[in-house]
Amino acid sequence: IRDRSSGTAIEQACTVLASAIDNAESVALVHNASQMRKDAADSCGSDSLREVLETNVVAINTINQRLIPLLPRDSSILYVGSTLAEKAVPGSFSYVTSKHAQLGMMRATCQDLMGTGRHTAMICPGFTDTEMLRTHLGNDPAVEKMIADMNSFKRLIEPAEIAELIRWAHHNPVINGAVLHANLGQKES
């Protein structure tokens, strides 16, 4: 879904996805899209917060309402959170707020789907080598190195590593309701 703030775009995508789900034995519904802005609690405008929540929270709810009832047993609803789903850093107010909300959505999803044969989890990547992170860091190699040095492997996480964890989470319902941190042993301050 290109524009998760557009109800029409979400509805059109759900219609296409519903037909694909119809013949599937198992589906991994992965909520990965997010907006990340540089903002703070004392300066984040309500309209800006509303836009972030529309993409990062409300769109997920809309998709879940449409698609969860169609998911066969052995399916999963996987939320891609962040290390910021359970903590906070300065300058990411709306993102942190939305990731905490996604964690609550995952936990509620776990409770609401009891006995359905479908499971959920939240995958919380650390600093991953993505366009979103590089943009947030100002495409500054020195800042990127400083961030990479904040984990025990002194590197950014590769997107393929997160993709593999998502695939694993889909095939292992034993983790239902779990928060899976994938941060290479991020240094705490």
What are these regions (language model features)?
Residues 32-38, 185:
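Conserved NAD(P)H cofactor-binding loop of Rossmann-fold oxidoreductase domains
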Residues 40-50, 147:
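Substrate-binding pocket helix/loop in short-chain dehydrogenase/reductase
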Residues 115, 127-150:
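A glycine/serine/threonine-rich, flexible loop-to-helix segment
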Residues 76-101, 106-115, 127:
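Catalytic loop of short-chain dehydrogenase/reductase
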Residues 114, 119, 174-178:
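Short, small/polar-rich loop/turn modules that mediate ligand/substrate recognition or access, typified
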Residues 155-182:
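C-terminal substrate-recognition "lid" of short-chain dehydrogenase/reductases
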Residues 1-8:
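Rossmann-fold cofactor-recognition segment
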